Every structure is written in structure tokens, then in C-alpha cells.
Curated annotation (Swiss-Prot):
Main location: membrane
Tissue: Widely expressed.
Protein name from the UniProt record: Guanylate-binding protein 2
Function: Interferon (IFN)-inducible GTPase that plays important roles in innate immunity against a diverse range of bacterial, viral and protozoan pathogens. Hydrolyzes GTP to GMP in 2 consecutive cleavage reactions, but the major reaction product is GDP. Following infection, recruited to the pathogen-containing vacuoles or vacuole-escaped bacteria and acts as a positive regulator of inflammasome assembly by promoting the release of inflammasome ligands from bacteria. Acts by promoting lysis of pathogen-containing vacuoles, releasing pathogens into the cytosol.
Membrane topology listed for this record: Lipid-anchor
One MF term in the entry's GO annotations: identical protein binding
Chain intervals for the UniProt region annotation (GTPase domain (Globular)): 1-309
Intracellular or extracellular location(s): Cytoplasmic vesicle membrane; Golgi apparatus membrane; Cytoplasm; Cytoplasm, Perinuclear region
Amino acid sequence: MASEIHMLQPMCLIENTEAHLVINQEALRILSAINQPVVVVAIVGLYRTGKSYLMNKLAGKRTGFSLGSTVQSHTKGIWMWCVPHPKKAGQTLVLLDTEGLEDVEKGDNQNDCWIFALAVLLSSTFVYNSMGTINQQAMDQLHYVTELTDLIKSKSSPDQSGIDDSANFVGFFPTFVWALRDFSLELEVNGKLVTPDEYLEHSLTLKKGADKKTKSFNEPRLCIRKFFPKRKCFIFDRPALRKQLCKLETLGEEELCSEFVEQVAEFTSYIFSYSAVKTLSGGIIVNGPRLKSLVQTYVGAISSGSLPCMESAVLTLAQIENSAAVQKAITHYEEQMNQKIQMPTETLQELLDLHRLIEREAIEIFLKNSFKDVDQKFQTELGNLLISKRDAFIKKNSDVSSAHCSDLIEDIFGPLEEEVKQGTFSKPGGYFLFLQMRQELEKKYNQAPGKGLEAEAVLKKYFESKEDIVETLLKTDQSLTEAAKEIEVERIKAETAEAANRELAEKQEKFELMMQQKEESYQEHVRQLTEKMKEEQKKLIEEQDNIIALKLREQEKFLREGYENESKKLLREIENMKRRQSPGKCTIL
């Protein structure tokens, strides 16, 4: 079963200290232990706007994330709380609470942009928390969204078609949820009652004009619409009287404003029901170890003065996991071969048949646990390792057979050697008596079971080592004429030549078997990889179709509002995405 994590309280994940971002290693160890898919909800907003209260509600606790209800704001950096998902079994809810933006007490707000960017990069649902209505001041305070193009890269190299890199953000970015706190106005637009979502969409309407003021008005709205096509809005009444706000976490629901309680329940219900599992491009599901890798890669890039690159982060993660997938597959191969093979096998084919079955399983394991294997680098490595392991088993099989046959020969032919030493055959007629006894022992050897595929080779080598004894017995047998001896010599030569031919034929047969196995192995790699690539291509097309649909919806909206330039830009992005929807090549081994 996948592991469940029960953190009793939040822990700092990324500390913002002295203008540096430092990862908490203990938090990484916790992420490493979460094998379940993670739903990552991050909240960002100005300092002392009640972000932590909402996050505690999502954790199902009154206390946990520090509320900072005094004049001094509490949360510094990014804090993490991992809890079992309350509605979706087998998933872990990872809550990320961030330090308040633009805190005057910090004096140095240079890391605010990075905190904002990291919250976007790591989350599957991004909650922006602000006070009051969505007016120009609220938009100005959300200037961080306009800076994302300067803080984040989606691709490691520029797009050849000239499309702006930020056009790819949609495929990586989370759902955007705007939480409006202490909202006291009626939800009206042009005298008509509207929903919070309709209010948000109205607030994101652009103004026409090319002057600096209009551009400043439009820029944050444009970025939200382009980068976050999936948007949601919630409004919250003031939770209690002002004098009670300082002890909000101690108040029971009956002491809070009933509308606020209902609004919080609606918010948490939405998050629990609709916040998606964090995924990467290609539908790669993020679990704890993968989230850990993303944290390390992104913070590492920021610390080194680079921009966090989403494509590079995925490829870094792929390098780690693909290497582990190779090892996992090889371990399975070795374990299964050791368990199932009975050495020595009687034929090479028997061993190769077993190898083929377990090799297929090993390839399945690798492909199941790997992704984004560029140019099939890791699958090629797996193929080479499987060949090496196979050859090691073939050698071991031969060694076991040779050792067993040598012991058997010593047992069977040992008494004959003793009789030779004692001179039993050093008499007239002794040569043929020796041959007769040796043939009987050879028959006994051949009938012995479980010798393996080296049986004939070991016997041949043994006979070759005794050729001088046979030659001596033949020469000294006084009962044989010279002519008879010549005939016997020729017979021995013919037997030797026949044995050599058999050995040559066996080598050729082994070569052909190995070539056949090599081709079968290649075809198995190609078959399984092709199936995986088809499945990945299907997922990628579905993913891109969803992105295209979101972009089309926004493009049509721009067109209806009369913003033809923005509509044309999105249309170019959509056409470029459609052109890129081509299947990958299968080039392995």
C-alpha cells in the first residue's frame, strides 16, 4: 500500500533567511516518504490577510499554520503541511502557506517574487488571498503575475517558431483561485447580481487604448487570463468583530459570522473536490519524491542565479527516476533468473527461453517506472545490461556444467586410471581391453542425468588429456601387428576429426541461437516501447487538446470584447501547438 503521512503540524519547507532561500532537509525527507499522488494547494497574498486561517481549515485543524494576528506577521518562506486527502483515498494533500508579500517589516522584499513564482510552480491549485474588492489597487498588488515571464522559463531553449516562451505556461500552471476576504459589497455588475466567478471575469475585462495608464491597467489582467485559463473566485465576509479577530483560531463556529462559516465550507469543499493531483507535462503524476525533486531543482536554479525552467526540472527528475527504473528492472531480472533457473540446463535454448520471459518482465518494469527517456538513452542502457547479465548466466551455467562433469568423470573414470597405473593393460591384448572398459564407462557417463551442455566438451577434453596413455598402450601391445596399429591410428584420427566437426556445428548452432535471441530481444524492446509511445502520444494529444480548448475560449472572449491583437496572438499560439502534435520517433539500441 502507498504510504500515508500524518504530520501533526506544519514544517518550514523553504526558509527565506537573509535574502536567501534555504530548503529544510527534514521537510524533504517527509516528501521522500510520500509515495501517493499529491494534491498541492499553495496560498499567496499580502501579509496579515488571513491566509493561514484558510489553510488550517483545509488541514481540518483550528491551529497549525501561524495566524500572525498581531501586528507582526509570522510565516517566513514557504511552510508545508502534508495530510491524508479528506475526500480522495490514496492521495495526499500538501498545503503550502507562504509568507506575506510586501511586509514592511522585512525591509527587503526581493524574495517576494521568488516566493510567488515557487508557489505557482509547485502547486496544482494556486490561491491568491486579498482583502476587499478586486479594484485597481488589488491588481497593482498582484504585480507579481506580470513578472512571471522574467522569473520562469517553460523551455530550456527558444521556440523555433518564434512563439513567446510564456505561451507554454498554460500547460504547467495551476488552477487560479482568488479568495476575497472581508468582502462587504453586493456582488453586482451594472446593477445585475452576479456570482463570484462572474465578478472575477468582469474584473479581468481589459480597457481599450495604448497609453501607459491603460497598459498598466491591462497588463496584470492580461497575464491572469493568458497564464491561468482555469479560474475560480470565492468571497468571504468578515469572520467576526474586530476585537475578536486576534483570537480567531480559538473561536467556535457558533461565535463566527454564519455567512463566513458557510463561505469557508464552500471554499474547502471546492478545494477537496476539484483540486487536481499535481501533474507534469505528458500527464506525469507527481508524488512526494517527485515534488521533492522539483523543490530542489527550482530553488537550486534560483540560488545559482538562473531562472527556474519547467522543462529542465522535468528532465532532471526523469534522469533520477529513469536511472532508478533501470536498476529496478535489472534487480528483478537477476532475482527471477536466480530463482527459476535450474543449473546446469541441458541446452542453451532452455536458458534463453527463460531469459526471454524474464527480459520481457524487466522491460515492462522499466517502461512503467520511466518517462521522458530522451533518445531512449536509459532503455539502451537497460538493453546492454540485460545482455551482460544474460551472458553472465550463460557463463555460470557452463561453469556449473563443467564442474559437475569433471567431478562425474573423476568418479567414473578414476578406477580405470588406477588399473592403468597398476599395469592391468600392459600385456598382449591389453589395448583393446582398455578400449572396451573405457567405452563402457563412457556409456555410463553419457547416461548420467543433469550434466548440462558442457558434457561432451568436458569428456573430449578429458580424453585428449589421456591421449599419451592410449598411444603408449597401442604401441606396446605385442599382440597387434604394425598394420593393425596403423589402422587403429587412422580410426582415432577419424574419430577426432568427427568430434571436431561436431564441435564446429555446435558453435555454429550457438551463434545462430544467440543471433536469433538478439533479434527477439530487439523486437521486444521495440514492441513495448512503441506501445508506451502510443499511449504517451495519446495522453499528450489529450493534454494539448485541453490546453487548446482553454486558449480558444480565451481567444474567442478577446474577439468578442474587441481586442483583435490579443485574439490573433492566441490564435498563433494555438496553430503552433497543433503543428507540434506529431508522434515521436522510436530509435533504440
